[in-house]
């Protein structure tokens, strides 16, 4: 993986960097037609047209690639035929050709190459791209696309450069302990499946977007501070010049306390499976 730097020919180019796709991707062709569906841009609106997620809108038109997060094709070998760009995520994807003729997209893991064979099996080899249940994976192994519920599909560690580490297994064999990239340590059912290795494109977080326009191409709109709004737009707004917010503590646009307020529901069932919270990682 390599980062491409640009000369300062314009203000927008100064300090701008991108991922060198030519060093990783194998094709500039269109994606597999059978695994592509249309995608309507919601621009952060719900079915009533009301904004439910701010700072979204615009951006380039995209088509959605159907990714196999379940990896439920058991004991059938597949060969990596291409490594492709996916506009819907910061990780790359691989096209897998299975011996029975079926094709599926999976997440690209660090170390994958065209021609490699991968398999999802109860006793799969501990090799990058293979899938196995957590109970059969040795301690210390780095994993991604980890299930939280057996058969539901991977939900943990799916973004670029992310991974979790298997720390240990319970004596009764029901749960295994994982350390997430956030520092959180939690238990997961040993029957859940996970993919061996780390997600690729690990240098994505080093990209300098260079100018606001590149974020607009991605569908990200500006984030405006409440203190520079009018009073009818935000509780922090109004006043002459740079006025203080006029409250004991900062609040959200809807008047609820912000910054430092715990928002997690302590009655969640998964609360008892969290051994160490990410806030206590030190």
UniProtKB/Swiss-Prot annotation:
Any Pfam family hit: Ribosomal_L2
GO cellular component: large ribosomal subunit
Gene Ontology biological process terms in this record: cytoplasmic translation
Superkingdom of the source species: Bacteria
Region spans: Disordered: 223-282
Sample GO molecular function, one term: structural constituent of ribosome
Gene3D superfamilies noted in UniProt: 2.30.30.30, Nucleic acid-binding proteins (2.40.50.140), Ribosomal protein L2, domain 3 (4.10.950.10)
Keyword set, alphabetical order: Ribonucleoprotein, Ribosomal protein, RNA-binding, rRNA-binding
Subunit composition and interactions: Part of the 50S ribosomal subunit. Forms a bridge to the 30S subunit in the 70S ribosome.
Entry's family note: Belongs to the universal ribosomal protein uL2 family.
Summary of the function given for this chain in its UniProt record: One of the primary rRNA binding proteins. Required for association of the 30S and 50S subunits to form the 70S ribosome, for tRNA binding and peptide bond formation. It has been suggested to have peptidyltransferase activity; this is somewhat controversial. Makes several contacts with the 16S rRNA in the 70S ribosome.
The name this protein goes by in its record: Large ribosomal subunit protein uL2
UniProt source species: Mycoplasma mycoides subsp. mycoides SC (strain CCUG 32753 / NCTC 10114 / PG1)
């Amino acid at each position: 993986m390599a980062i491409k730097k640009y000369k300062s020919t314009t203000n927008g180019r100064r300090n701008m960097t991108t991922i060198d796709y030519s060093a990783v991707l194998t094709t500039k062709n269109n994606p597999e037609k059978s695994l592509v569906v249309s995608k309507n841009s919601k621009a952060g609106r719900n079915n009533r047209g009301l904004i439910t997620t701010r700072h979204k809108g615009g951006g380039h038109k995209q088509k959605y690639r159907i990714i196999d997060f379940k990896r439920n094709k058991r004991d059938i070998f597949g060969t990596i035929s291409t490594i492709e760009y996916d506009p819907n995520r910061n990780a790359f994807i691989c096209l897998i050709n299975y011996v029975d003729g079926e094709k599926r997209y999976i997440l690209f893991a660090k170390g994958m190459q065209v021609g490699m064979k991968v398999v999802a099996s109860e006793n799969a080899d501990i090799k990058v791209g293979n899938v196995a249940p957590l109970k059969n994976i040795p301690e210390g192994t780095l994993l991604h696309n980890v299930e939280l519920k057996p058969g539901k599909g991977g939900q943990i560690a799916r973004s670029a450069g992310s991974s979790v580490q298997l720390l240990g297994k319970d004596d009764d064999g029901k749960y295994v302990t994982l350390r997430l990239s956030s520092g959180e340590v939690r238990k997961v059912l040993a029957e859940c499946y996970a993919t061996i290795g780390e997600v690729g494109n690990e240098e994505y977080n080093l990209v300098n977007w260079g100018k606001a326009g590149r974020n607009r191409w991605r569908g990200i709109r500006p984030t405006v501070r409440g203190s520079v709004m009018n009073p009818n737009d935000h509780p922090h707004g109004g006043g002459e010049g740079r006025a203080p917010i006029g409250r004991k503590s900062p609040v959200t646009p809807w008047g609820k306390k912000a910054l430092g307020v715990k928002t997690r529901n302590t009655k969640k069932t998964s609360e008892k499976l969290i051994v160490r919270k990410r806030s206590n990682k030190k």
